[in-house]
Amino acid sequence: MRNIQLKSFSVNQLIFLLMAILSLLWHSNPVMAHAALVKSDPPRRATLSTPPKQIQLWFNEKIEGAYASVVLLDSNKKSLTENNPEVVADDPKSVVLNVPEIGTGKYTIQYRVMSVDGHVIESSFDFNIKNKMQ
């Protein structure tokens, strides 16, 4: 009789443990997926012959436009942009920032965005503009 109760108790523990693990996996899955930059124009480390008119960044998740920041910096780390980026109307995973006229040199794009799940990502990357003759 005692042996049957022990087996029953072990099966109940196993079922409880499996349910707890499944519950944790089910609820933690959205937390593991955060926004990430998947593409940019200009591209990372690109060398361009003509300056871009705008910066566009694409992410793997929708972006909260009110919390997006994209800044263009010159080689002295001075900001060249004063306006905020806008989420592209027909592509909520993308933001665009108009760029003033710039010349040759090394530039840095700094960005900070919040995805719709509330996760904030920030990073930066460089690109260069060279004369066609260089």
Stretches found by the model and what they are:
Residues 27-28:
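N-terminal signal peptide c-region/cleavage motif recognized by signal peptidases
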